[in-house]
Amino acid sequence: MAMVRAHVELDERELNDQVRTFERRRMASLQRRIANQARADVPVDTGHLGQSIGEGQIRFTGPRTVEGSVHALAKYAAPVHEGSRPHLIRPRNAQALRFQIGGRTVFAKLVRHPGTKARPFLRNAGLRIASRER
């Protein structure tokens, strides 16, 4: 009967360094693909919301754990993504609101906004890219 014995020692520090390089590249690739998918999915009016989509920093939160993010920095990104409840719009610096309806100028002291439906372009992009990874 033949027998082989082996003794293997892992250099944890070296392993972590090599894994970090791989993880950083992998996270950067995921962030880039999610951001591109979100830009393709974003509702377009002026294009500012799509232009505000970017990738956050990559951070290592543990020995072999990496974290990254994709964000939209436009002021109105959260209400578009999450939706909004019905609410009142009142003038801040004047006595009335002024806006156009059908080419006519309208003045109002108060507007009852009906709210907006959520359009979660970032979440949907993340889920779509993640589903391709499995």
Ranges and model annotations:
Residues 1-134:
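Short, Lys/Arg-rich flexible segments
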